[in-house]
């Protein structure tokens, strides 16, 4: 566990989506602030992680804000989506070993071995490494979306898209999006 610092400490190297325990189980690419330790994680995974972004941390008059950009294709929300209920289940790089519990058309119900989280993961997101079944970054979170909002398209997965909205990764039905 990192110590608490008297002055703000800004660090990178590990993309923020690997800190899903600090973001309520969500995979995020925006900067994270641990106020207790006075730490700022700013690595959005740009050019290292598919769906990453370039983050800027802005300090002004003792207050911090952030901004970011990515080079992903975008879409406009044409049908609203309600936020998924409950704690999101996610798999990320440092906790990528999974156990396949059941299979159905195109996806498997998996348990993330390090966290116990269970979620359906598309078969194309699973791989074998050193004899273990693993998964690329994925989540079952569905962010709240309003008509007219813009989202980044991380990956099209048949009837669903893995998107990024305001720096948060999530799922959205393809039919709810107008691709630009």
Task: Describe the function of each predicted region.
Residues 1-180:
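Feature recognizes metal-dependent phosphohydrolase scaffolds
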């Amino acid at each position: 566990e990192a110590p608490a610092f008297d002055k703000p400490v800004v660090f990178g190297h590990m993309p923020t989506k690997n800190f899903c325990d600090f973001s309520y189980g969500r995979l995020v690419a925006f900067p994270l602030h641990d106020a207790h330790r006075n730490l700022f994680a700013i690595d959005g995974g740009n050019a290292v992680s598919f769906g990453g972004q370039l983050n800027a941390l802005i300090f002004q008059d003792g207050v911090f804000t952030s901004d970011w950009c990515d080079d992903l294709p975008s879409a406009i929300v044409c049908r609203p989506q309600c936020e998924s209920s409950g704690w999101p289940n996610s798999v990320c790089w440092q906790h990528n070993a999974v156990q396949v519990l059941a299979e159905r058309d195109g996806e498997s119900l998996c348990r993330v071995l390090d966290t116990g989280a269970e979620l359906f993961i598309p078969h194309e997101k699973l791989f074998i490494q050193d004899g273990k079944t693993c998964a690329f970054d994925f989540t079952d979170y569905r962010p709240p979306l309003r008509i007219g909002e813009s989202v980044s398209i991380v990956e099209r997965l048949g009837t669903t898209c893995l998107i990024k909205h305001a720096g948060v990764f999530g799922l959205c039905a393809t039919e709810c999006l107008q691709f630009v």
